[in-house]
Regions:
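Phosphate-binding beta-alpha-beta segment of Rossmann-like dinucleotide-binding domains, i.e.
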Residues: 20-22, 26-73, 88, 92, ...
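Glycine-rich Rossmann-fold phosphate-binding loop(s) that bind the pyrophosphate
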Residues: 79-80
């Protein structure tokens, strides 16, 4: 018997478990922590928190200028349960929110006042691009250097989804060459 937190766990081979007559079960998912972490990362990036904390320990106070969220564009890859919660908080900050996914629900977009868009528009327009899709082959390497090159140089990339949705090697290149302003990762 295998029990996992959440209803889906990509690290469990369900086919092999079934062949071996192993029961796999999951607990009910709690979506609240993921949007909270997403916003902790966004706020930390927008306000340069790591740099400010490091500077404070060295005796410097308020050494950077943060980014105001009001009026900025929040792009979401995925507008399911987690993405919808992130969108609501973005709207509360006065952000314009846009979303794309392969199975985007237009009724959800309308209900949340989220602009549906193409992947291309979602890559090039946001000030903050946050990923909220399930890992796996469907979205593997959804964000590579090709996409990061099209992002605003001042944009931040946030990923609290599981799996290799962002190419790690490409992200390192984009950050080291200042193709994007920063990244927040779970």
């Amino acid at each position: 018997f295998i029990i996992t937190s959440g209803l889906k766990n990509k690290s469990i081979d369900l086919v092999s478990a079934k062949k071996r007559k192993i029961i796999v079960s999951g607990t009910e998912s709690n979506i609240n922590p993921t949007p909270e972490l997403t916003w902790a990362l966004i706020l930390g990036l927008a306000r340069n928190l790591k740099e400010e904390i490091d500077n404070m320990y060295q005796g410097y106070w308020q050494s950077t200028i943060g980014v105001e969220l009001k009026g900025k564009i929040l792009g979401l890859i995925g507008l399911g349960k987690v993405g919808s919660q992130v969108a609501k908080i973005g709207k509360a900050f006065g952000m314009q929110v846009m979303a794309w996914s392969e199975n985007l629900n237009l009724d959800t977009c309308k209900e949340l006042d989220v602009l549906p868009c193409s992947k291309e528009d979602l890559i090039k327009n946001p000030d903050f691009l946050s990923i909220h899709v399930q890992g796996g082959e469907r979205y593997k390497n959804c964000i590579t250097i090709k996409e990061m090159d099209k992002m605003k140089k001042t944009a931040f990339l946030i990923n609290t989804s599981r799996g290799p949705i962002i190419s790690e090697d490409d992200l390192i290149i984009a950050l080291s060459t200042n193709e994007i302003a920063g990244a927040g990762l779970d």
